[in-house]
């Protein structure tokens, strides 16, 4: 077995990992503000307050809104997803096998991306309803109202991420699952990855925090409320280790997340205790 790896193969494998990460690795990265190619260990997301328009008299100065300018710092950390491969030469000739290994690394990095975003969403203290019930229409409408009261834009960039238990509970809500309310094109049965309802893209996710008392933290938020930053795209390093007679494939990525505007996040605490 060769102990050196052709660099063209390494670059091709790296591209496959990156493509898999972009396509399937993270469910939530596209739902938040995202920065790429960040230089250094941190970056800043700007936040601007609300402005109020006013009149002015003839020849008077235009009134100044005195907007409050604030920012949130996002700190990046390095994350790795590596594995040992005894027969790397097989990857060069077996496309299916190579894609399996590439996907494994990409999905691991994608899960970490979602974990970072969820960790920031969990900082929300804007709760809709109590934590003694599951996800029902009443709790959904209370969260919807809370977003409106905070003037969160209803501009097509709202997202709601819920657990699979809550997704099945929503399927029992006729306003969510019936074509009479949402139209045939928006029925959740056409695809379980996401569904639009109440001007919001609803996404089921298996990685949401399950806290004490089997309470799942589900979140409804605006894209601008959470920031994600990446220092670089997915990188891959392949090295030979003679003591193991194997190659080590390491996929790595520098990234971080931060909550920018807590008012843009409403959390629905949902009880998953068996009835």
Where are the predicted features?
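Glycine/small-residue-rich hydrophobic helix-like segments
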Residues: 191-240
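N-terminal "assembly arms/tails" that initiate or stabilize quaternary assembly
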Residues: 1-74, 265-273
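Extended, solvent-exposed, turn-rich assembly/linker loops in the middle of proteins
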Residues: 123-193
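Alpha-helical scaffold segments that mediate packing/assembly in large oligomeric complexes
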Residues: 86-152, 267-275
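Short helix/loop capping segments that flank catalytic or ligand/cofactor-binding pockets
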Residues: 53-56, 169-172, 258-260
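Short acidic, glycine/tyrosine-flanked loop/strand segments centered on an H-E-D-like triad
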Residues: 69-91
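Extended, compositionally biased alpha-helical segments that mediate assembly or anchoring
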Residues: 238-275
